[in-house]
Amino acid sequence: VQKIILWANKHSLKVVPSGGRTGLSGGAVAKDKAVVLSLDKLNQIENFNEIDKTVDCGAGVITEALQDFVKEKSYYFPVDFAARGSSQIGGNIATNAGGIKVIRYGNMREWVAGLEVVTGKGEVLNLNNGMIKNNTGYDFRHLFIGSEGTLGIITKAKIKFTTLPKEEQVLLLA
């Protein structure tokens, strides 16, 4: 990703990150000499940490793949959408998505312990690195969560998970 950003800068081209293409707002539409950068191949899940309850995910990891991965280990990733089979972790973070369980579990921001981001100048930033208590100053990771790719391209995230709920009940309010 960094090399593509540097190349695009050299040729005065814009870069539009593209994830699962589940957004309906048109934010990932490229125009005016723009390069579309697919993040599909950044789909690795690694460094499962049962003590800190975190796992490292590439931006292209499908939401449902992460849910299944932690569920196999008897844990739970609660950020959930109807588009779970195609939405990607990077896009979920870039939009600070909430999903169908947002009232109970919060938005994506609550589940991001660390970020790796490539800025528009090609600089790679490692933000927070999963520290649970970090009182060293500004936590710039929160600037990128919900910024929709305007400040940089999310390439990797340290995602939190939790224990499986004892039971679930669905309630329809109309």
Stretches found by the model and what they are:
Residues V1-L42, C57, F77-V79:
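Glycine-rich N-terminal segment of FAD-binding domains in flavoprotein oxidoreductases
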Residues Q44-A174:
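FAD-binding subdomain of flavoenzyme oxidoreductases
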